[in-house]
Amino acid sequence: MLEEALAAIQNARDLEELKALKARYLGKKGLLTQEMKGLSALPLEERRKRGQELNAIKAALEAALEAREKALEEAALKEALERERVDVSLPGASLFSGGLHPITLMERELVEIFRALGYQAVEGPEVESEFFNFDALNIPEHHPARDMWDTFWLAGEGFRLEGPLGEEVEGRLLLRTHTSPMQVRYMVAHTPPFRIVVPGRVFRFEQTDATHEAVFHQLEGLVVGEGITMAHLKGAIYELAQALFGPDSKVRFQPVYFPFVEPGAQFAVWWPEGGKWLELGGAGMVHPKVFQAVDAYRERLGLPSAYRGVTGFAFGLGVERLAMLRYGIPDIRYFFGGRLKFLEQFKGVL
């Protein structure tokens, strides 16, 4: 039995097979255990002799089992290490990494410029009411200024639009044509003084070409308080120009009409590298009728008027135009064309 058992133990291929051999010989119903149980039937002298033989066999089997178990464990460990070994000389697996969209990069840069000047960045809804997009901004129905904006009007029932304080807003709905509605929303919910910028996406129903898109981005600015003048507006635009184009940049203001500001101006920045004036956006002093519309809306909500005796300025500029200048992009349609080769150029740009 001993020779047979030792040979079987030595040839065991894995720990499961070794466990089965241990049970076969040393288990409760094992061969050696049964032999030892039969010792009681033997005469005393023969029992003593046979008991010594069986104990020696048991010790030999236990030693062989322990040695084989250790050998199998070492072999399994070696195999696992070999299987999991990493060849550090092999080239690493390349991982796909994304990057920020150039519009996001430009928008973040603009917001950070104004945050350094004490402005707070806020956002408004893209689905807007006719009141906030037009009426409250001194662009009533049938006003000729509405022809300046080609609008996406929304049809259908069941959409609830919330106002600045969570109230339900009635009237026709549209995709906002500019970020200016957030001026009114913010003024309804807050009292001056304050400085805010409003980055966001806007929509115009117009034909697309290299410089025009139906969907684009604007950055709106609004400052309201006592004694705010055109000089403060010019100072803010000068700071923007120097942050974007360097300390040698110059700013030019030209009079222009916008219904929600009076006086209104269009501002351009001298671009030293390009050697030309770049029209960036429009600005002006907030029209008194806008303040009146805000106070009237506040009173309907049971709030006291807050915009009598204050002044403010507002400005707006196109994010795409600045991004095209910053990154040398010739066609605005590249931004939303979905071409990976174009977008991958901006990996790592912060």
UniProtKB/Swiss-Prot annotation:
Listed Gene3D superfamilies: Bira Bifunctional Protein, Domain 2
Molecular function, one GO term: ATP binding
UniProt record, GO biological process: phenylalanyl-tRNA aminoacylation
Subcellular location field: Cytoplasm
Keywords: Aminoacyl-tRNA synthetase, ATP-binding, Cytoplasm, Ligase, Magnesium, Metal-binding, Nucleotide-binding, Protein biosynthesis
Top class in the EC scheme: ligase
GO CC entries: cytoplasm
This protein's record includes keyword Metal-binding: yes
Positions annotated to bind Mg(2+): E262
Enzyme Commission code: 6.1.1.20
Domain of life: Bacteria
PROSITE patterns per the UniProt record, alphabetical: AA_TRNA_LIGASE_II
Assembly and oligomerization: Tetramer of two alpha and two beta subunits.
Identification of the protein by name: Phenylalanine--tRNA ligase alpha subunit
Organism: Thermus thermophilus (strain ATCC BAA-163 / DSM 7039 / HB27)
Species lineage: Bacteria, Thermotogati, Deinococcota, Deinococci, Thermales
